[in-house]
Each structure stands twice: as structure tokens, then as C-alpha cells.
Amino acid sequence: MSWSIVIAGLIVGLLIGMTGAGGGALMTPILILLFGVTPSSAVSSDIVAAAIMKPFGGAVHYRRGTVHMGLVAWLALGSVPAAFCGVFIDHALGSGEAMQQNIQYAMGAAIILAAAAMVARMLLDSAGRRTASQAGDGPVAEIRVRRLLTVGIGAFGGLLVGITSVGAGSLMIVLLMTVYPQLSMRQLVGTDIVQAMPMVGAAAIGHAMFGGLVFAITASIALGGIPAVLLGAWLSSRGSNFLLRPILAFVLTASALKLLGLGATDLAITMAIVALVGLPVWAFIDGRGRPAAAWDAAGIARRRTLALVSAGTPVGVGFITAALYFGRMRPAIVQAASQDAVPASEPFRAGSPVSTRV
């Protein structure tokens, strides 16, 4: 057992619990880039650890009633066989060094998708897809399951998880958000965690059959991750993680580009551009999606802040303002909106007709 991997598992577990991000996108690159674990062993060990950890989070959501079991069944119908197929593809990509490199490149591409999904999730939230009235646990909304599409989503996620261990978190949640906007975020997260249990279990069995599993790594991840996930979930209900999400998306992008073979200098330049431009753009889009009345109620100048974010980007002022927006302004604006039931700004007005086509 490696205590350094235990500590890494603890940190990753905290981030998973606080943000709802997928563990594979976080832990697997750490094993490869920091601990020198081969990609195939990193994927196998992380998936088996996830299979051990998922039931803890799933049990919490099931007791809270935030799981749509109908969706779980149809997602599992696609994800379980696809996860097995992903494992087979993993070992059909080649042998020796060629296989390891192919798995690493596939993982880098999947993590970029996960980072993009995390950004999309926050932008969908800011666009009014999740209102204050949908934030609570509450009973699961009555929906008609779109069976074929749901099975397809499960198959897509299962295939990615089987190959790379990435995809059970942010990617699946964003896909479900677009298909089932009636479900609250907690219900989406709960449904995703429970459906991931059979999917990850199938992938874990497949990897154990093919070899590559390092029990010491799996045990170290689980030892640090299980209590940390529970602690992170507890902390997330008592504090803001608005700034944590863009930081996490940034780190995921950097690790993905490194896995894809980008050199240190090119990586530093690329990530500097991403930070200096991406964060202000994100803040501007998110800020414009917040109702002006909520800005006023929070005592924050909307027009001036958005002007600094946009016009100040070329000289770095936009980046600083965007960081302040996500860290301090946005939580205050969201709180003001929820307390005063402020209607959302155009084009998503509260009370406006929302399509419920399923």
C-alpha cells in the first residue's frame, strides 16, 4: 500500500464529493503522470476502486429519494454491455508500449470531453436550466423515459468508462440534463451515481479478467477516497464551490493535454491563454445570465463588472475580475436571487413555457 496514493485518493475524493466530478478524470491522470503507473494498470485499478466507492454515494442518494430508478434501469441496459466492450477494445488496441500509448491518448481525449462537459454544466445552470425551486431534494419528477436515447447515453458512457475509466461523472450528467430538463441537479447526480454502480462493476470485472489490476493501488485509492467523498459531500452542502469548478476544469484540461503528449513549454503557453481568455468569457456568459434584479439585491454593479470582464481581458484585468466574480460575487447574486425569487433574465424567464417533450 502506498500512503502517497492514499493522500492523492483523499484529495480526489474531496473534489468528487464537493463538485460531483467523475473520479476517473481526476485520479487516473495522477496515477500516470505523478506516480508512473502504466495507463492500463491505472485504468484497471481506478475502475475497481470506483466500483468499491460508488455504493457509498449511491446509498445516500437512494435514501434521500433523489434517484430515478426507471432511468437507472434503461441506462444500465446500455452501459453494462458497453463497459465490457470498452475493456475488450482496450486490450485489442495492441500490446506492450503501443497499447499503453493508445490508452493514454484515448484517456486524454476523454478528459478533454469531461472538462468541456463541466463547463457546459455550469453554463446550462447559469442559463436558467436549473432554477432555485429545483434545487431541493424533493420527490423525483414524473417523466416519460425516452428509452432508446437513454440506452444510447448509457452505452456511450459505458464504452468510455471501459476504455479510459472516464465518463461516469460530468459527461453523463450533462447528457441527461439535455434530455431530462425536468429533473433537478441533485436528482441527476443521484441517478447518475446509482446507474454507475452496475456500469463500473461490469468494467471492473472485465479488467480483473484481463489482468493489469494492481491491488495495492486499488486499496490505497479506496482507503483515502471513501471517507473523503463523504466529507466532500458534507462540505458541499455547507459552502460555495463556484470557484472550485473552473479551477477543476482548468486542471483537467492541463492533465489531458499532457497525456496527449504536449511539451512543458507548449503546455504552459496553452494553459496561460486558456486561463486569461477562457475564465473571463465564462464569467461574462454566466453573469449575463443572472437577472439584473439579483445583482442589485446583492449590491453589485452589473454593467461595470461585465465591462471589466470583457474589456479588461487583453491586459489581465478581465481574469482578475472573473476570479472575483466566481469566488465572491456569483454566490451573493445566486443567494439574492433565491431569497427574493427573482425572475430569470431573457431569454429564460421564470414562468415562461418550457418544453417537456420526452
Predicted segments, located by residue:
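Juxtamembrane transmembrane-helix boundary motif
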Residues: 1-8, 12, 33, 62-159, ...
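Transmembrane alpha-helix interface/packing and boundary motifs in multi-pass membrane proteins
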Residues: 9-20, 155-165, 312-315
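Generic transmembrane alpha-helix signature in multi-pass membrane proteins
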Residues: 27-29, 55-64, 158-161, 172-174, ...
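Interfacial segments of multi-pass membrane proteins
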Residues: 27-41, 171-187
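Membrane-interface alpha-helices at helix entry/exit sites of multi-pass transporters
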Residues: 38-48, 68-74, 182-193
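Hydrophobic, aromatic-rich membrane-embedded alpha-helical segments
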Residues: 160-171, 175, 302-328
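Membrane-interface alpha-helices
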Residues: 193, 197, 319-347
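Amphipathic, cytosolic membrane-interfacial segments at TM-TM junctions
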Residues: 285-309
